[in-house]
């Protein structure tokens, strides 16, 4: 029983340290270009979906074409319920692996007979631990993946993969930015009358 308590304390300490260093899968530093002073182009992307390379390529091309634009990128967070499920699975996975390794039967604690899968896990500890680890990681990744690639210019949405269902091509993005920049220049040139 003491060992189980020790495993729970250790697992919660690991999760807390991971959460403070990497809140909900968000990279601890934002991806940004700080030397530009113009309008802010902000990307919110699903890093676990592999969109980081796409963002970096777009950032490179846009910074060459529009040197005055400030570009920021950050992870698009999933809904809180999915983040909590992923956090719970992370702790549960560690506790379950610890119980398998130690050989403690948690079902005896509740006065239940151990199911056959638990007995199989005790006979095949390495396979059982690997299966728990990979299955849990698969579910955690599914919970944390949003599929998002959202782009805003000065907090005005210009592209949403969640709405459109696909990433913008480089030509589409450049055309959108050209139109937005022309509109901004036009709006700035209109004299403002006070009433």
Curated annotation (Swiss-Prot):
InterPro entries the UniProt entry points to = Selenoprotein_Rdx-typ (IPR011893), Selenoprotein_T (IPR019389), Thioredoxin-like_sf (IPR036249)
UniProt tissue specificity = Ubiquitous, detected in all tissues tested.
Q: What is this protein called?
A: Thioredoxin reductase-like selenoprotein T
Broad enzyme group: oxidoreductase
The Swiss-Prot or TrEMBL record describes its family as follows:
Belongs to the SelWTH family. Selenoprotein T subfamily.
One cellular component term from this protein's GO annotations in UniProt: endoplasmic reticulum
Span-the-membrane segments of this chain are: 85-103
The Gene Ontology terms for molecular function here are:
thioredoxin-disulfide reductase (NADPH) activity
Q: Give the protein's function.
A: Selenoprotein with thioredoxin reductase-like oxidoreductase activity. Protects dopaminergic neurons against oxidative stress and cell death. Involved in ADCYAP1/PACAP-induced calcium mobilization and neuroendocrine secretion. Plays a role in fibroblast anchorage and redox regulation. In gastric smooth muscle, modulates the contraction processes through the regulation of calcium release and MYLK activation. In pancreatic islets, involved in the control of glucose homeostasis, contributes to prolonged ADCYAP1/PACAP-induced insulin secretion.
Q: Where is this protein localized, as stated in its record? A: Endoplasmic reticulum membrane
Q: Locate residues linked as Cysteinyl-selenocysteine (Cys-Sec).
A: 46-49
- Signal sequence, start to end: 1-19
| Keyword terms | Endoplasmic reticulum, Membrane, NADP, Oxidoreductase, Redox-active center, Selenocysteine, Signal, Transmembrane, Transmembrane helix
* Its membrane topology: Single-pass membrane protein
